[in-house]
Structure formats: structure tokens, C-alpha cells
């Protein structure tokens, strides 16, 4: 089987709640780190989520 082109990443909340989303990205097309504005249920607001490695 071929090696997958996408890698799994964590999107960690910038509100320091410890909440994160897991998603995938293609590192060939998206070379810079992802930064998305998503919902954080701990603070019940939309906050910035930044890319981090999955441990």
C-alpha cells in the first residue's frame, strides 16, 4: 500500500483550556502552520486554534 499524503494534526485552543480538535492536512499544499477560528465549548466562544503535533 502507498504511504498516505495527509498527516494528522492537533488544533489546540489559544484560550488555554486544553481543548483541541484533530484534523488532517496535506503538508505539500499547506506548508505553513494552520490557524483557524473555531468553537471552544469550555469557554463557550469562538477562539483561535493553532496547529500542534499529535503526541
From Swiss-Prot:
Q: Does the keyword Protease apply?
A: no
Looking up Pfam families in the UniProt record yields: Ribosomal_L33 (PF00471)
Q: What Gene Ontology cellular component terms go with this record?
A: cytosolic large ribosomal subunit
Question: Which GO molecular-function terms appear in the entry?
Answer: structural constituent of ribosome
Q: Which GO terms describe its biological process?
A: translation
Q: Which UniProt keywords apply?
A: Ribonucleoprotein, Ribosomal protein
Family membership, please give it.
Answer: Belongs to the bacterial ribosomal protein bL33 family.
Please state what the protein is called.
Large ribosomal subunit protein bL33
Amino acid at each position: 500500500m502507498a504511504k498516505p499524503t495527509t498527516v494528522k494534526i492537533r488544533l489546540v485552543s489559544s484560550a488555554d483550556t486544553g481543548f483541541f480538535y484533530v484534523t488532517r492536512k496535506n503538508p505539500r499544499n499547506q506548508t505553513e502552520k494552520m490557524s483557524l477560528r473555531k468553537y471552544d465549548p469550555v469557554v463557550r466562544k469562538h477562539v483561535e486554534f493553532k496547529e500542534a503535533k499529535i503526541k
